[in-house]
Curated annotation (Swiss-Prot):
Cell inner membrane recorded as keyword: no
Residue ranges the record marks as coiled coil: 15-69
Highest taxon above the source species: Eukaryota
Localization per Swiss-Prot or TrEMBL: Nucleus; Cytoplasm
Pfam families the record matches: NAP
Chain span(s) of sequence motif Nuclear export signal: 36-51
Protein name: Nucleosome assembly protein 1;3
GO molecular function, one term: histone binding
Domain remark text: The acidic domain is probably involved in the interaction with histones.
Region (Disordered) location: 279-301
Keyword Cell membrane on entry: no
PTM annotation (Phosphoserine): residues: S297
């Protein structure tokens, strides 16, 4: 399994770096307070106390929200199961009597995901044939409701042996906010010659009897199951590497959030394209609001 979890040494190093940054921010915070006039400082102190009370309420809200989401996720379960049976052709809808060779709803999940802008960028033409065998996607909470896990169910196919591909996100609490600790994906057992994520190229060597092999990496949706990894060599973790790794992990989490919060609960709307229209309308409404604000500002000026 691919695992971006940091070693204890790297964790300690990163924690120390974060502590230093937090210390610098704290010192900056103190400088701001000390620069205030005494009477203003008293008012700000009261505002800080109000904010503290707000944060306590917000923490309770997030706790209750998480429990409520878990409750309704269980209630959604039977609906998702029935949807899966119809999509895969296990269950026929009432009133359908005509015998047909085609079962279920072909390419349901492939089309649903391709209609989403974020996921469409991850799905390449070479992925599509394999994703036609995808018959269901599920997710569930883990780690006391903090983390979550995906399960991708596939029919028997010529690409890989796995019937189920999983991706697990382990989260930790950081100032009452869930922070990604690590992500673990299934190691895909590709059938020979059908790997979509990489290819081993071989050519003869002029200097040796042994052939030269080179692994060519390919862009693929199935790289989702191989989360970004931290280099083993600490010397390679420079500022650019850290920034690139952070961008990769943020992108990976965006994909996961899209699957969890949009695609799975509203799959048929993404399949038909209705969800795309709703998102486009929402984006258009925001743009219109911003344009109105700009016009208002110009008139004032």
């Amino acid at each position: 399994m691919s695992n971006p979890e940091l070693s204890s040494e790297k964790k300690a190093s990163l924690v120390e770096t974060l502590k230093n940054k937090l210390q610098a921010l704290a010192e900056q915070h103190v400088d701001v307070l000390e620069s205030l006039a005494p009477v203003v400082r008293k008012r700000v102190d009261v505002l800080i106390e109000i904010q503290s009370q707000h944060d306590e309420l917000e923490a309770k809200f997030l706790e209750e929200k998480s429990a409520l989401e878990a409750k309704y996720h269980k209630l959604y379960g039977p609906l998702y199961s029935k949807r899966s049976e119809i999509v895969s052709g296990v269950l026929e809808v009432e009133g359908e009597t005509e015998e047909r060779e085609e079962k279920g709803v072909p390419d349901f999940w492939l089309k649903a995901m391709k209609n989403n802008e974020i996921l469409a960028e991850e799905i390449h033409e070479s992925d599509e044939e394999a994703l036609k065998y995808l018959k269901d996607i599920k997710w569930c909470r883990i780690d006391d409701l903090k983390g979550f896990k995906f399960e991708f169910f596939f029919d028997t196919n010529p690409f890989f042996k796995n019937q189920v591909l999983t991706k697990t996100y382990h989260m930790i609490d950081e100032d009452d906010e869930p922070i990604l600790e690590k992500a673990i994906g299934t190691e895909i057992e590709w059938h020979p010659g059908n790997c979509l994520t990489q290819e081993v190229l071989t050519k003869e060597s002029l200097e040796s009897t042994k052939p030269i092999t080179k692994t060519e990496e390919y862009e693929s949706f199935f790289n989702f199951f191989s989360p970004p990894q931290v280099p083993e060599d600490d010397a390679k973790i420079d500022e650019n590497t850290v920034e690139e790794l952070q961008n990769q992990m943020e992108r990976d989490y965006d994909i996961a959030s899209t699957l969890r919060d949009k695609i799975i609960p509203h799959a048929v709307s993404w399949f038909t394209g209705e969800a795309v229209q709703d998102e486009d309308y929402g984006a258009s409404w925001v743009d219109d609001e911003e344009d109105d604000d700009d016009e208002y500002s110009d008139e004032e000026a």
